[in-house]
């Protein structure tokens, strides 16, 4: 009975009384029955083993294993298991608790098997350790090891058990890949060892090689060798658990993985040139970098004069006209961030997130400054696209543009067709991202709106062909274009300032725009730019020498209209040094008309700025103004037919449009907020939703909506002059230059008791709010009445959205003496310009969206300063 209490290798086992408490009274029967020469230990009991335990839970009973399950061999290996098995096979039909007995038997056998597996693994580890220490086992050592293995439990039997395939091991069925840990080593037969004279294996120092070959994580890996020619080629390669299981490439299996394979990552060379010089793998990479290259779309004149030449950086192509013959659109390995990367091509008046691929060869070369600045350059829509901070965007500086020819040809006289300027936009983008252009739109009220080039000998300007009339008298000529002006940084992301109402020094994220778009030829004809026809009333040129300017000039979504002049860089457009606050010295130093400035408006949700200007343009150029129900849906949006993903918010109330409603938050649809903000798409958000989105990064839930607006306890919160002083003070705190003229006589004032409602009802009456655009002027009282009512009206703060106020007219600059308007650089703006429309009061806000009087007032403002 000693084997029951102390079985195996000296390990304590549960006694018989513990395992079977009901058999204490029959110990003499157990001693008789469990003797190993019992007549019940016949071959019949071992034959019963095959039917009961013939499954794959225990490897001993699988097919292919040597059958040694006689009771004698079981007794030799594990006495307790043998005796319990004999008991069970004999009395399983008479036991009252046979299910419990069977369960207990299985559990005890499983414990024994686990213990044997642990012991076997320990022996294998010791054997491997002895192999690494000794170079080759001699004959004596091999005999000793054989004696040790035979003296202990049957090691060869255990090896054979492990060598068979286990039906419960799923790894054998997924990818048959060998590793040294799965199979025991056979030191005597399987491997050939070459003994060295010194008795040790010469292991080379691989530390230098590892330091030499360490590259960046984004660097493309060479095809992994099968390690057949290396020194340790017999060692199976360790599988590194990365994003892709590399075993499938070795096994030749196409096992789909859930993660993105590493081959779809951008193949960007590392930044350090020392690493690149030591590796021959760089020669297989395409010629691009993540730096800011002078691309083929870069500017010829950073103060230099000369024709534009395509930049041949690395690839010197012999193909004429610089045609793209590689078909990079079909190369899915180059699309660095999946299929969405090809939509980042920048177009003249559209955001980089256009659907389709209209100008891929022309606008691919626009440099996205870096990974961080490109985040400020384009903001992805609220969907699951990738981050530009973590995803590098490759730039093909060596590829040439296929759109324009490099040499003048006979076909260049004819207008080239732009195939499908923009495709249907993706439906997950919201309404503000619809493409809207001043050119290539339905000509309901805009006749002759084809974009044409001047009648030169070789016209590089392109046209969007429309079946409409082209007025040759209104085609812009040579003198309209500047070729020597320096390049200006034109676009900054609107989210880079904390408060949207501050004009600040936005020197951080920028993007450089070219001198002109079209003249790619070598002949020096720099005047054939991207020409807008000045004939149709939606054009900026219908206003004589004037175009609107806005505060931050960001194109995040698509733009409402092209407020820019025909040249994109007329005199530098506006120096970004003062955050789009043009100083008068900048204006005076320009040789061109000082009133011809303009930039792309902010977004489609800059409702009042673009729409009021368009209304005044339509009214001044074509007679009756065309009233639109909302500035967010202008008439130029004829190209866009995508359904918005959520109801579009009505734009800001226009003073001349009776149908326009107040600005509504696109998230909570409120109309009362102390400060209007914008989401990354440019749609208006209330202060609460905007702050919530900026702080938390998610949209503010509607359950948090409340109509109670908490105010700060300011003593003079309702006075207009203090509000304007606060806004100018904040602007001056950001080192921007503000010129606040004290206009006493010729200031435009309101004929109502409340200031005009601006974009999102932003007026100077609100503290810290610089309006975006002014309202179109209407006929008002004469100068005497304006002077008499200049400093009287102080509207209450709550009253500004309740009524739409017409605006007093401009006074002609001939009627207003210059001495009556002294200049003031004070931080506190006086009260009279606070009641005036903000374009006259605050030149930091150059959105003078007026008619003829607006350009005259700008001229007067320039002269007075």
Swiss-Prot record:
Compartments where located: Nucleus
Biased composition (Polar residues): 582-592, 715-724, 737-764
Gene Ontology CC terms: nucleus
Ranges of biased composition (kind: Basic and acidic residues): 115-126, 180-189
Matches recorded under InterPro entries: AreA_GATA, AreA_N, Transcription_factor_GATA, Znf_GATA, Znf_NHR/GATA
Gene Ontology molecular function terms on file: DNA-binding transcription factor activity, RNA polymerase II-specific; RNA polymerase II cis-regulatory region sequence-specific DNA binding; zinc ion binding
Residue ranges, annotated region (Disordered): 1-75, 115-140, 177-227, 557-605, 617-663, 713-854
Keyword list, A-Z: Activator, DNA-binding, Metal-binding, Nitrate assimilation, Nucleus, Transcription, Transcription regulation, Zinc, Zinc-finger
Pfam families: AreA_N, GATA, GATA_AreA
Coiled coil: none
CDD domains listed in its UniProt record: ZnF_GATA (cd00202)
Gene3D superfamilies (UniProt xref): Erythroid Transcription Factor GATA-1, subunit A
UniProt record, GO biological process: negative regulation of transcription by RNA polymerase II; nitrate assimilation; positive regulation of transcription by RNA polymerase II
Bias kind Low complexity: ranges: 32-46, 771-786, 830-844
Chain intervals annotated as zinc finger (GATA-type): 665-689
Biological function: Major nitrogen regulatory protein.
Protein's recorded name: Nitrogen regulatory protein nrfA
Source species taxonomy: Eukaryota, Fungi, Dikarya, Ascomycota, Pezizomycotina
């Amino acid at each position: 009975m000693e084997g029951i209490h102390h079985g195996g290798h000296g390990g304590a086992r549960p006694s018989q009384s513990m395992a079977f408490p009901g058999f204490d009274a029959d110990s003499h029967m157990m001693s008789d029955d469990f003797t190993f020469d019992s007549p019940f230990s016949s071959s019949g009991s071992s034959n019963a083993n095959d039917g009961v335990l013939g499954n794959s839970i225990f490897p001993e009973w699988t097919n292919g294993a040597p059958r040694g399950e006689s009771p004698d061999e079981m007794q030799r290996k594990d006495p307790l298991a043998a005796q319990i098995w004999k008991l069970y096979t004999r009395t399983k039909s008479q036991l009252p608790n046979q299910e419990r007995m069977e369960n207990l038997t299985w559990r005890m056998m499983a414990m024994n098997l686990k213990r044997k597996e642990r012991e076997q693994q320990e022996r294998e580890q010791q054997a491997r350790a002895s192999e690494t220490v000794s170079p080759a086992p001699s004959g004596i050592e091999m005999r000793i090891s054989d004696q040790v293995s035979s003296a202990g439990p049957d090691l060869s039997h255990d090896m054979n058990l492990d060598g068979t395939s286990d039906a419960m091991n799923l790894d054998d069925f997924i990818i048959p890949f060998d590793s040294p840990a799965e199979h025991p080593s056979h030191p005597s037969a399987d491997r050939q060892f070459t003994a060295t004279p010194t008795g040790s294996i010469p292991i080379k120092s691989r530390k230098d090689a590892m330091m030499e070959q360490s590259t960046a994580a984004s660097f493309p890996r060479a095809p992994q060798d099968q390690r057949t020619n290396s020194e340790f080629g017999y060692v199976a390669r360790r599988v590194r658990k990365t994003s892709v299981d590399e075993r499938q490439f070795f096994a030749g299996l196409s096992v789909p993985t859930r993660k993105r394979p590493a081959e779809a990552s951008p193949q960007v060379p590392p930044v350090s040139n020392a690493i690149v010089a030591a590796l021959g793998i760089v020669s297989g990479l395409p010629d691009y970098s993540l730096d800011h290259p002078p691309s083929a779309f870069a500017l010829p004149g950073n103060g230099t004069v000369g024709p534009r030449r395509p930049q041949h950086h690395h690839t010197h192509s012999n193909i004429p006209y610089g045609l793209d013959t590689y078909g990079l659109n079909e190369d899915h390995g180059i699309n660095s961030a999946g299929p969405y990367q090809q939509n980042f091509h920048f177009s003249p008046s559209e955001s980089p997130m256009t659907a389709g691929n209209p100008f891929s060869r022309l606008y691919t070369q626009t440099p996205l400054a870096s990974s961080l600045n490109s985040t400020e350059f384009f903001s992805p829509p609220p969907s699951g696209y990738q981050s530009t901070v973590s995803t590098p965007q490759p730039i093909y500086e060596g590829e040439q543009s296929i759109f324009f020819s490099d040499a003048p040809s006979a076909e260049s006289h004819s207008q080239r067709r732009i195939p499908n300027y923009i495709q249907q936009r993706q439906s997950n983008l919201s309404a503000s991202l619809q493409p809207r252009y001043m050119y290539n739109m339905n000509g309901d009220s805009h006749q002759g709106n084809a974009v044409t080039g001047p009648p030169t000998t070789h016209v590089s300007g392109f046209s969007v062909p429309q079946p409409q009339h082209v007025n040759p008298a209104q085609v812009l000529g040579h003198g309209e274009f500047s070729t020597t002006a320096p390049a200006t940084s034109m676009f900054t992301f609107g989210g880079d300032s904390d408060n949207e109402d501050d004009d600040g020094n936005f020197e951080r994220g920028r993007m450089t725009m070219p001198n002109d778009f079209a003249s790619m030829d070598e002949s020096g004809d720099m005047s054939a730019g991207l020409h807008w026809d000045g004939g149709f009333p939606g054009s900026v040129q219908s206003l004589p020498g004037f175009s609107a300017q806005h505060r931050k000039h960001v194109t995040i979504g698509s733009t409402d209209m092209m407020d820019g002049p025909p040249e994109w860089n007329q005199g530098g457009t506006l120096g970004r040094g003062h955050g789009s606050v043009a100083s008068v010295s900048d204006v005076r130093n320009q040789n061109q008309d000082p009133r011809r400035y303009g930039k792309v408006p902010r977004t489609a949700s800059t409702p009042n700025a673009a729409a009021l200007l368009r209304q005044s343009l339509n009214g001044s150029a074509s007679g009756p103004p065309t009233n639109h129900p909302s500035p967010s849906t202008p008439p130029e949006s004829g190209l866009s037919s995508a359904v918005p993903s959520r109801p579009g918010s009505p734009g800001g109330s226009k003073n001349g449009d009776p149908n326009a409603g107040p600005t509504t938050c696109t998230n909570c649809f409120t109309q009362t907020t102390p400060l209007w903000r914008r989401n990354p798409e440019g749609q208006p958000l209330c202060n609460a939703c905007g702050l919530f989105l900026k702080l938390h990064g998610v949209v503010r839930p509607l359950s948090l909506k409340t109509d109670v607006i908490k105010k700060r306890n300011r003593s003079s919160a309702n006075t207009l002059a203090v509000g304007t002083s606060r806004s100018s003070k904040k602007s001056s705190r950001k080192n921007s230059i503000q010129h606040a003229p004290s206009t006493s006589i010729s200031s435009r004032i309101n004929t109502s008791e409340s200031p005009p409602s601006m974009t999102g009802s932003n007026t100077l009456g609100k503290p810290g709010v610089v309006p975006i655009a002014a309202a179109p002027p209407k006929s008002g009282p004469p100068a005497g009445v304006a002077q008499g009512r200049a400093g009287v009206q102080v509207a209450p703060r709550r009253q500004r959205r309740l009524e739409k106020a017409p605006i007093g007219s401009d006074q002609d600059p001939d009627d207003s003496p210059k001495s009556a308007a002294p200049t003031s650089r004070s931080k506190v703006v006086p009260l009279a310009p606070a009641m005036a429309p903000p374009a006259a009061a605050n030149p930091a806000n150059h959105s003078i969206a007026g008619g003829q009087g607006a350009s005259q007032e700008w001229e007067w403002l320039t002269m007075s300063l």
